[in-house]
């Protein structure tokens, strides 16, 4: 599966870390240079939409703070439901979710896009609906508008979390403690 990683040009440190993670997993991932904008949220939104617009095959999209917490990536991916549109390999789960099969739960009420796979169908569907200048940050748009509409799944155990680091998006050190939220996958 093709892989893309979103990275700001001035954050070579984050690209170096992410690329090392990909090498350890045996993944070939291309760096996508983030679109610069004075508003960091708009930069993030524009960049996510630009990535979706170039998806022509099933594609893994990572953020540059991704941290793999399991070496079972290919094993878990191979058990994904056949009808998937979007796969989350970790996330901030806000409510209990329904188990579907093997390592996969129906994904609703979940934030974060640090490790997500998209089909071309899902990418097209999102780009037709998402306004990067609108009121939502991309993660929130997916949670509210896309997860209820498409076949979105999240795995347990999580394969990826977000590494604690300074976030250019939030202008502060960010530590999301995502592993704790996987307990909502009953």
Predicted features and spans:
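An acidic/histidine-cluster motif and surrounding catalytic segment
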Residues: 1-62, 66-186
């Amino acid at each position: 599966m093709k892989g893309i990683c979103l990275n700001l040009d001035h954050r070579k440190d984050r690209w170096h870390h992410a690329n090392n993670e990909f090498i350890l997993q045996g993944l070939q991932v291309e760096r996508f240079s983030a679109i610069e904008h004075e508003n960091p949220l708009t930069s993030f939104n524009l960049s996510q939409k630009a990535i979706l617009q170039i998806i022509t095959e099933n594609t893994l999209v990572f953020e540059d703070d991704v941290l793999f917490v399991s070496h079972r990536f290919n094993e878990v991916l191979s058990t994904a439901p056949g009808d998937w549109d979007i796969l989350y390999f970790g996330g901030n789960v806000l409510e209990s979710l329904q188990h579907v099969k093997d390592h996969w739960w129906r994904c609703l009420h979940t934030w974060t896009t640090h490790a997500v796979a998209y089909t071309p169908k899902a990418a097209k569907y999102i780009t037709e609906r998402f306004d990067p200048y609108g009121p939502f940050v991309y993660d929130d748009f997916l949670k509210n508008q896309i997860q209820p509409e498409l076949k979105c799944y999240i795995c347990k155990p999580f394969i990826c979390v977000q590494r604690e680091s300074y976030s250019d998006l939030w202008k502060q050190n960010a530590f999301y403690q995502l592993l704790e939220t996987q307990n909502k996958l009953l």
